[in-house]
A protein has these predicted regions:
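Short, surface-exposed secondary-structure edge patches
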Residues: 3, 27-31
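Short, charged beta-turn/beta-strand-edge "cap" motif at the junction between a beta-strand
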Residues: 1, 20, 42-47
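Short, basic/aromatic beta-hairpin or loop at an interaction surface
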Residues: 5-18
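Conserved beta-strand/loop element in small beta-rich adapter and peptidoglycan-binding domains
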Residues: 34-40
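Short alpha-helix capping/helix-loop boundary micro-motifs
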Residues: 22-26, 36
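C-terminal structural segments of small proteins and small subunits
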Residues: 9-12, 43-74
Length: 74
């Protein structure tokens, strides 16, 4: 499932970061890597998605979230 599909309060584990080398480098530099836990703090329509990962609160565009695959945790 894509990160953009997780609902507010949803938690998951990153399974893949797709995209070109520049995007992958940018995302990994802020700590989003395969295997890291991630929580969606806010997922409002047509707005960037606010996520919490590794003690940081990060806003990510919907377009970028579509390139990040996660496995939902319950």
């Amino acid at each position: 499932m894509k990160l953009s599909e997780l609902k507010t309060g949803g938690m998951g584990t990153v399974t893949r970061v797709a995209g070109d080398a520049r995007f992958v480098s940018r995302v990994t530099s802020i700590g989003i890597t395969e295997g890291c836990p991630i929580e969606v703090v806010q997922n409002a329509k047509k707005r960037p998605i606010l996520v919490f990962e590794r003690d940081s609160l990060i806003a990510i565009s919907r377009k970028d979230c579509d390139l990040i695959d996660v496995e939902e945790r319950r």
